[in-house]
UniProtKB/Swiss-Prot annotation:
Name of protein: Small ribosomal subunit protein uS4
SMART domains tied to this protein: Ribosomal_S4, S4
Keywords: Ribonucleoprotein, Ribosomal protein, RNA-binding, rRNA-binding
Protein family per UniProt: Belongs to the universal ribosomal protein uS4 family.
CDD domains named in the record: S4 (cd00165)
Domain S4 RNA-binding residue range list: 97-157
Native species: Ralstonia pickettii (strain 12J)
Lineage: Bacteria, Pseudomonadati, Pseudomonadota, Betaproteobacteria, Burkholderiales
Record function comment: One of the primary rRNA binding proteins, it binds directly to 16S rRNA where it nucleates assembly of the body of the 30S subunit. With S5 and S12 plays an important role in translational accuracy.
Subunit structure as annotated in this protein's UniProt entry: Part of the 30S ribosomal subunit. Contacts protein S5. The interaction surface between S4 and S5 is involved in control of translational fidelity.
Region entry Disordered, spans: 33-54
Polar residues compositional bias, start-end: 42-53
CC annotations in GO: small ribosomal subunit
Gene (name only): rpsD
GO annotation, biological process: ribosomal small subunit biogenesis; translation
InterPro entries recorded: Ribosomal_uS4 (IPR022801), Ribosomal_uS4_bac-type (IPR005709), Ribosomal_uS4_CS (IPR018079), Ribosomal_uS4_N (IPR001912), S4_RNA-bd (IPR002942), S4_RNA-bd_sf (IPR036986)
Length: 207
């Protein structure tokens, strides 16, 4: 399945919640009706969505939030299922520990897509070494920094300013002036914001 390149707001409307694909720090709720489906007047249907439909919809939503394709997502679930503990929570922790997501959480990119681009263009250092693999897993204590020659990019400075205003997640420590941060640990489930019901995904793959 190819990566979606169409209007970002349309995906958020389809899921009925802001996926933060277009703007990481500003909600789409003020710009469009998230409670109506895409279309001129929104698609309506009297049919009740099945349990399977709800489970599939939740999986699609999480894939879109983190920008992960189906094959990657299955691998993440298999790894989460293999580990001890709550499978759904572990799945979200694995997704949150992706390098592109950590770059986004530290405010270097205004969206995950922009953060992924920074990683792919070798603008990111991990423990002093350039790493251009968006899916790389970040570990506790890893230091993420903007490469020296990329620090002059206006979009990075603007994104950091917005991130400082809205606040950073508690599992990262960011020095905005140095344009670097430390990944303290994978987040607890309670610290992961967003309208996500990971139990539906576990149910889907347990069918």
């Amino acid at each position: 399945m190819a990566r979606y390149t169409g209007p970002k707001a349309k995906l958020s409307r389809r899921e009925g919640t802001d996926l933060f694909l277009k703007s990481a720090r500003r909600s789409l709720a003020d710009k469009c009706k998230l409670d109506s489906k895409p279309g001129q007047h929104g698609r309506t249907s009297g049919a009740r969505t099945s349990d399977y439909g709800n489970q599939l919809r939740e999986k699609q939503k999480v894939k879109r939030i983190y920008g992960v394709l189906e094959r990657q997502f299955r691998r993440y679930f298999a790894e989460a299922d293999r580990r001890k503990g709550n499978t759904g929570e572990t799945l979200l922790q694995l997704l949150e520990s992706r390098l592109d997501n950590v770059v986004y959480r530290m405010g270097f990119g205004s969206t995950r897509a922009e953060a992924r681009q920074l990683v792919s263009h070798k603008a990111i250092l991990v423990n002093g070494q350039a790493l251009n693999v968006p899916s790389a897993q970040v570990k506790s204590g890893d230091v993420i920094a903007i490469r020296e020659k990329s620090k002059k990019q206006v979009r990075i400075a603007e994104s950091l300013t917005l991130a400082e205003q809205s606040g950073f997640p508690i599992w990262v420590a960011v020095d905005a002036k140095k344009m670097e941060g430390t990944f303290k640990q994978a987040p607890d489930r309670a610290d992961i914001a967003g309208d996500i019901n990971e139990s539906l995904i576990v149910e889907l793959y347990s069918r």
